[in-house]
Every structure is written in structure tokens, then in C-alpha cells.
């Protein structure tokens, strides 16, 4: 779903949770609703976009109520990060920080976190989305310039990627061989095969 073409101009009409690691958001443009279901369990964090959603009458809690009926002004991604920001007309925003077991949704007021979906991640109250924006050079030159610091430089690659590289002989490889392995992994990530 192309959120930047869908959500601007819509109002947030409900934000609630029925499960510990799940947030449902409903946006409406006066004609139809658009739903975002944010699932944040550590084993698989993802966003899905159901066509409709029936809210349970029990075990449901309203969240981010200060944003209700506020109009969306923009949707943006943070460069080289697994994050999405939904901006509202009143200088507030919802930041979807999709970082594996550290995933969270933060209510921002003037770029500063003021409320959290996963309250136990209190360090998120000190974070700013601009600190996560970065330009990463994926070229061979960038790779060689960051020799020995690859895990810190290529922050968007998580543990399974580095584990795969290790299984393919990363530790024993020289820099040229590592570059070939790295390039191969990038190709796999950009053109994935998956089965349902």
C-alpha cells in the first residue's frame, strides 16, 4: 500500500490495542477507512493493512487519544532505517520504529517522544527520529572504507544476515572474498525468494 498517497488528508479516528504487541489504527477521509495493523512481537515485527477490522467489545484499550481526529499531513520513511513516520497537521507524529525485539511506536510532539506503545522501552523516550537517518554507501568503495566496522556501518542488516555470512565463510575470507559474499547477500535481499 502506498501510504503517502492514501493517508494525507485523512483523520485518525481510532487507535487501540486488543493484544499486548498489536496496535490498530483507523484513518478516515470522510468516505472510507484505511487500517494499519502494527504487530510488534519480537519474532516478527510487521505492518499489515486489512480492508476492515472488527474491534472486540472486551479486552480493548484506546491509545494515543490526543491524536484522535487529527489530520495526517504526510507519511515518510527514515533513510536507511526500518522506520515510518506519520505526520499530523499539529506538529505531532507517530513514529513506527520497526527494530526487531526493540520495535515500538512513539508519539512525537515537535520531534520529541512523549508517549510509547511499548511502555517498558523507556529509553525510547530519549530518542529522536533524525538520529536514525543516515546515508549508507553500498558500493565496493564504501565497503572497503569501513573495513572491520561493517556491522556498525551497515546497521540495517540484522543478525540473520551476519549469521548467514558467517555460515558462508565470512570469518576466514579476505576482503575481496568478503566483498563478493556481501554483494551476493545484497542481491538476495533485493530479489528475495519466498514461499507461502
Predicted regions: what is each one?
Residues 1-14:
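Extreme N-terminus nucleophile/cap motif
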Residues 29-196:
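Phosphate/anion-contacting hairpin/loop surfaces
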Residues 24:
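Non-catalytic, usually N-terminal nucleic-acid engagement modules in DNA/RNA processing proteins
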Residues 19-21, 79-80:
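Residue-level recognition of beta-strand termini and adjacent short loop/turns
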Residues 6-8, 18, 66-69:
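Flexible, charged surface loops at secondary-structure boundaries
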Residues 14-17, 76-77:
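Short beta-strand
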Amino acid at each position: 500500500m502506498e501510504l503517502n498517497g492514501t493517508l494525507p488528508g485523512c483523520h485518525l479516528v481510532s487507535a487501540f490495542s486488543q493484544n499486548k504487541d498489536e496496535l490498530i489504527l483507523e484513518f478516515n477521509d470522510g468516505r472510507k477507512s484505511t487500517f494499519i495493523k502494527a504487530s510488534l512481537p519480537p519474532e516478527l515485527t510487521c505492518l499489515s493493512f486489512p480492508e476492515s477490522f472488527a474491534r472486540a467489545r472486551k479486552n480493548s484499550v484506546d491509545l494515543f487519544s490526543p491524536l484522535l481526529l487529527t489530520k495526517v499531513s504526510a507519511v515518510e520513511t527514515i533513510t536507511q532505517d526500518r522506520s515510518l513516520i506519520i505526520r499530523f497537521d499539529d506538529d505531532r507524529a507517530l513514529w513506527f520504529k520497526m527494530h526487531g525485539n526493540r520495535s515500538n511506536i512513539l508519539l512525537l510532539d515537535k520531534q520529541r517522544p512523549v508517549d510509547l506503545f511499548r511502555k517498558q522501552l523507556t529509553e525510547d523516550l530519549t530518542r529522536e527520529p533524525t538520529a536514525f537517518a543516515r546515508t549508507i554507501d553500498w558500493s565496493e568503495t564504501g565497503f572497503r572504507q569501513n573495513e572491520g566496522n561493517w556491522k556498525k556501518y551497515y546497521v540495517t542488516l540484522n543478525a540473520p544476515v551476519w549469521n548467514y555470512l558467517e555460515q558462508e565463510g565470512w570469518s576466514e575470507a579476505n576482503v575481496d572474498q568478503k566483498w563478493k559474499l556481501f554483494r551476493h547477500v545484497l542481491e538476495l535481499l533485493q530479489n528475495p525468494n519466498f514461499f507461502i
